[in-house]
């Protein structure tokens, strides 16, 4: 049974909402782009500098034209998430609403984990190693965070554009640091993002899915970390006619995406030995 477009959009939105709620990094990257993701590539704006040329205006001669401080890079959409949840014993037009909701939630969660892992790897491979491999301690964690912050400020990243994803071990050290501001002291809007606190003006998130247990923190930003996605095949419930599943259907859909760190020096990865 074919799904109408309105229902496909609703299902796709529900899956995407769960994906966003599950994935940390999908909410922290820059989502701006020009083009059509499903075509295989898009153009992403890359800010060249924080410094915008300016001078006094002359009422007689006007002002000299300057070029925009933004260039564009091509982001290849080369990753593919899919939804293919079997609904055994129910044809597409007879699936209970509760079961639909359950499968959409499951699909969104699985996609969120997969997306988060891909974006994590994008940061680790596209970022820059920071400092030495000496493990952080209660006495050094604040100093190292501030040193990393300073490096990004020198690269013209505003503190409000920075974010930090810390391992559970690093979070434990931050909790013992008097400079760390716990989430309970932050505004509701910040808490709603999943932040666990703030240090040096940087919003901090705990991340427990680093494949490399030597990673202590990543200091990233919402300017030069890019993530673009779109539904190549919107989510729908479809009858299975594969000759193997009788009287069954599946929730199916495909979400394509790509990610990039356009300025490696603005993503700092702190690892221990």
PLM region spans:
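N-terminal "assembly arms/tails" that initiate or stabilize quaternary assembly
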Residues: 1-73
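Extended oligomerization regions of viral-like shell subunits
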Residues: 38, 42, 46, 150-233
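Short, glycine-/Ser/Thr-/acidic-enriched flexible segments
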Residues: 49, 211, 223-224, 256-258, ...
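Short helix/loop capping segments that flank catalytic or ligand/cofactor-binding pockets
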Residues: 52-55, 86, 95, 173-176, ...
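Long, hydrophobic/aromatic-enriched structural stretches that serve as scaffold segments
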Residues: 64-101
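Alpha-helical scaffold segments that mediate packing/assembly in large oligomeric complexes
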Residues: 89-157, 268-273
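Extended, compositionally biased alpha-helical segments that mediate assembly or anchoring
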Residues: 239-273
């Amino acid at each position: 049974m074919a799904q109408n477009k309105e229902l496909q959009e609703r299902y796709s939105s529900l899956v995407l909402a769960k994906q966003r709620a599950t994935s940390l990094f999908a909410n922290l990257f820059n989502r701006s782009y020009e083009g059509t993701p499903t075509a295989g590539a898009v153009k992403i704006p890359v800010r060249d500098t924080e410094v915008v040329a300016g001078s006094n205006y002359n009422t007689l001669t006007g002002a000299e034209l300057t070029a925009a401080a933004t260039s564009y890079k091509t982001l290849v959409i080369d990753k593919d998430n899919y939804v293919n949840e079997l609904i055994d014993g129910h044809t597409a037009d007879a699936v209970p609403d509760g079961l639909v909701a359950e499968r959409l939630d499951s699909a969104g969660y699985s996609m969120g984990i997969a997306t988060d892992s891909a974006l994590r790897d994008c940061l680790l491979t596209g970022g820059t190693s920071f400092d030495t491999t000496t493990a952080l301690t209660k006495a050094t964690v604040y100093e190292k965070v501030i040193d990393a912050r300073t490096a990004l400020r020198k690269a013209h990243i505003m503190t409000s554009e920075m974010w930090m994803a810390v391992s559970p071990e690093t979070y434990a050290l931050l909790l013992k640091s008097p400079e760390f501001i716990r989430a309970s002291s932050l505004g509701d809007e910040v808490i709603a993002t999943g932040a666990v606190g703030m240090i040096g003006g940087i919003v901090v998130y705990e991340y427990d899915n680093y494949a490399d247990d030597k990673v202590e923190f990543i200091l990233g930003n919402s300017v030069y970390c890019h993530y673009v996605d779109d539904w190549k095949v919107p989510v729908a419930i479809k009858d299975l006619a594969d000759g193997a599943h009788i009287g069954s259907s599946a929730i199916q859909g495909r979400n394509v995406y790509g990610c990039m760190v356009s300025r490696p020096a603005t993503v700092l990865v702190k690892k221990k030995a």
